[in-house]
Amino acid sequence: MASCAVQLIDKVPKKKVEKKKFEPNILKEPCMKHPLQNRWGLWFYKNDKSKMWQDNLRLITKFDTVEDFWGLYNNIQLPSKLSSGCDYSMFKDGIEPMWEDRSNKCGGRWLITLAKQHRHTELDHFWLETLLCLIGEGFSSFSRDICGSVINIRAKGDKIALWTSNAENCETVTYIGRKYKESLGLPQKLVIGYQAHADTATKSNSITKNKFVV
């Protein structure tokens, strides 16, 4: 009987022991984005004389992180590649790139005019530096007075304007102008002017007087 029992035990199929694969416990870090102090909107304007001015202006997108800014910047045309009559505008969320907006109507702009021959040498660089000043709050505590910036591509020459909210605040406006000029690496002997939107809107000719210069 004992030998028979041994034979029966031997005939019982042995269970296969599955070897567990070793999987290291790797913690996947979430993709961390770096928030900006303000949310910004990028606008595009293309001149179509058959439409009202406002109908030619459209909001491309809004962003509020460093990564989203670069993702946007690297996937749109550079200003130097735009057709004549086109604009880019970047403004704080809630502000539209027009004089009539309540955040702009009492303000003005620091204006840089570039000759046509500088379009492929300086224009893109100056525009990028301007954007970095905006999103990086590059004007210290005076950044709260910044509304946004506009770049105009025109046949006769291009313009970059930095808009502020209060044209009467001399200390704030002049500080921003000096800091902006420094950030762009402009020579000291080069003078740039600040124009109040109210003066630009009521000018009698093509020239608007400068309220401040640096």
Swiss-Prot record:
PANTHER family: EUKARYOTIC TRANSLATION INITIATION FACTOR 4E RELATED, EUKARYOTIC TRANSLATION INITIATION FACTOR 4E-1B. One of its GO terms (biological process) is regulation of translation. It comes from the Eukaryota. MRNA binds at W53, Q54, W99, E100, R154, A155, K156, G157, D158, K159, T202, K203, S204. This is Eukaryotic translation initiation factor 4E-1B. The keyword GTP-binding does not apply. InterPro entries: TIF_eIF4e-like, TIF_eIF_4E, TIF_eIF_4E_CS. Ovary, muscle and testis. It is found in: Cytoplasm; Nucleus. Keywords: Cytoplasm, Nucleus. GO terms for molecular function: RNA binding; translation initiation factor activity. One of its GO terms (cellular component) is nuclear speck. Does not appear to be a mRNA-cap-binding protein. Pfam families: IF4E. The gene is eif4e1b.
